[in-house]
Amino acid sequence: MVKETEYYDVLGVSPTATESEIKKAYYIKARQVHPDKNPNDPQAAHNFQVLGEAYQVLSDSGQRQAYDACGKSGISTDAIIDPAAIFAMLFGSELFEGYIGQLAMASMASLDIFTEGDQFDTKKIQEKLRIVQKEREDKLAQILKDRLNEYVINKDEFISNAEAEVARLSNAAYGVDMLNTIGYIYVRQAAKELGKKAIYLGVPFIAEWFRNKGHFIKSQLTAATGAYALFQLQEEMKRQLNTEGNYTEEELEEYLQAHKRVMIDSLWKLNVADIEATLCRVCQLVLQDPEAKREELRTRARGLKALGRIFQRAKTASESDPLENSEPQKLNGNGKNHDEDTSTSPKSSEASHSTSGPQEPQSPYVEEFKLGDEQFNYYFPRPAPPPGAGKYSSSGYD
């Protein structure tokens, strides 16, 4: 018997709901009550705030246990993260769906199989996720082709529209960081394709491929680190909340406040790995389209690189603004644009990328998504090796 059911009622679930049921309920309701969906409702922001608080309390085992036993008086409100931030980290912003699609975590949360009972068919879930991911990539590739077609028709108008997009998307939760991540992949993938024109073993092309490969591996390791950090934080919070008499209320509040950033940063790392892997494949579909002529593909690559650089400028602009820099929403402190100098080493280029966060030991483990008592690995698409990397470039762009 729970003392209060208000948070359960807000999510529309019973007090016996599983973690998966709570997550799915939040995913559905958050998209319904999000302020962007209800611009004329003066209560929209409040409703979204309450929904976010309910989800954060009930999705944390320690907080949920305290809420069930004592109601709202037993939970730490200081540990509540801005609902707009947590929504963006879990499911992304709808403003960015035309660029990154539905994030993998959102796809996992929305799978119907989550409510089918305690028995999970991991192979079936993996196959569903692969299908959803393929549909996501194909849809994004078509959108990107249409967008780059504007570059072919009118370059000046394309640049003007891209700059307007930056102004619009920068206002979304973590919009600047999203733009920076998207811009980085666009620039690197375009540079790799444009490098195919070189002779002498296609050295620029191979260099870009190795840079992309190295960045991809680093991104996956960082994602694993993020998952591991979340696991450690969850276990430590359980330990802190279950220990009696060894801490003051002020000490516990300080601990929870200090780890807000760890939670957001860890979720961000997982999302970055998903976004980057997806966009790499999308760019390959667009820039290696067998139905397009060679010169058209080169024009697409030039347009993609231009778009990526415009997106990356949002990060530089925000970091030159003291008001932007003072906001706690910032995830990174590095301000160097990824493509200020394309001749710099991969190491220096990576140093400013948005996967960076607090210096943590790199985990050698691959993240495993857990369902009930079973686990399975969700593999993001890997970048394809450069065809003919060890041969003279005869099949690339001439």
Curated annotation (Swiss-Prot):
Location of the region described as Disordered in the Swiss-Prot/TrEMBL record: 315-398
Domain J intervals: 6-71
Tagged with keyword Cytoplasm: no
InterPro entries: DnaJ_domain (IPR001623), DnaJ_domain_CS (IPR018253), DnaJ_X (IPR026894), EMIR (IPR052423), J_dom_sf (IPR036869)
UniProt cross-references to SUPFAM superfamilies, sorted A to Z: Chaperone J-domain
Entry-linked SMART domains: DnaJ
Alphabetically ordered keywords of this record: Chaperone
Top-level taxonomic group: Eukaryota
Keyword Chaperone attributed: yes
Pfam families, per the entry: DnaJ, DnaJ-X
Biased composition (Polar residues): 326-335, 343-362
Record-linked PANTHER family: CHAPERONE PROTEIN DNAJ 10, DNAJ HEAT SHOCK N-TERMINAL DOMAIN-CONTAINING PROTEIN
Protein function: Plays a continuous role in plant development probably in the structural organization of compartments.
Family according to the record: Belongs to the DnaJ family. C/III subfamily.
Name recorded for this polypeptide: Chaperone protein dnaJ 10
Protein encoded by which gene: ATJ10
